[in-house]
């Protein structure tokens, strides 16, 4: 009896293992009932419950204006194309600005001519610039080398062939030093008065002994090349 039970148990186990397995690919999920799928917009096509974009359904992107939106009129140089203002250069060949109405235009000054509401400079109206002095203005006398022409002082080189400055009157002129000679109130250097420059030492001043290559002449050290035929350190 025990043997029959074991055989039956083995047979049942074989039947259970022989049952075909269910693949995940064979499992299908049905959509929930009563679920509304929204319609697909432009450029999209509904495939099952999914919206797939199809470029051929929207060859170019365009945006329509909101309904009942007032489009302002286009200004100068622009033309309305649909709801857009497009600039057309032929509608405005040149930029010009009209003055405000009832605006007084001041008269144009010298060298200028009024053209409409604009002052245009005309060189022929002012061949040379000149400025007249204020009336009743005293003009100071011109100095040396200058000649008064109208209200202006003009420099004339022939009136001052050489520049010279006279000293102030009653000013003591110090005596000229060595190598200089007094000419009027000026000291002029004369090289013949100082053929060689030499400086005498102060009295009672000890003169240090001269170093190599030098020989003492009076109170001065004079360099003698024969005393140092080659430089050595």
From Swiss-Prot:
It is found in: Secreted; Nematocyst. Its main location: secreted. Residues 19-29, 30-33, 61-63, 64-67, 95-97, 98-101, 129-131, 132-135, 163-165, 166-169, 197-199, 200-203, 231-233 form a propeptide. It comes from the Eukaryota. GO terms for molecular function: sodium channel regulator activity; toxin activity. The keyword NAD does not apply. Keywords: Cleavage on pair of basic residues, Disulfide bond, Hydroxylation, Ion channel impairing toxin, Nematocyst, Repeat, Secreted, Signal, Toxin, Voltage-gated sodium channel impairing toxin. GO terms for cellular component: extracellular region; nematocyst. Disulfide bonds join 40-51, 43-58, 74-85, 77-92, 108-119, 111-126, 142-153, 145-160, 176-187, 179-194, 210-221, 213-228. Each Am I peptide may contain 2 disulfide bonds. The modification Hydroxyproline is found at residues 39, 73, 107, 141, 175, 209. Residues 1-18 form the signal peptide. The record marks 29-30, 63-64, 97-98, 131-132, 165-166, 199-200 as: Cleavage. Belongs to the sea anemone BBH family. May inhibit voltage-gated sodium channels (Nav). This is Delta-actitoxin-Amc1a.
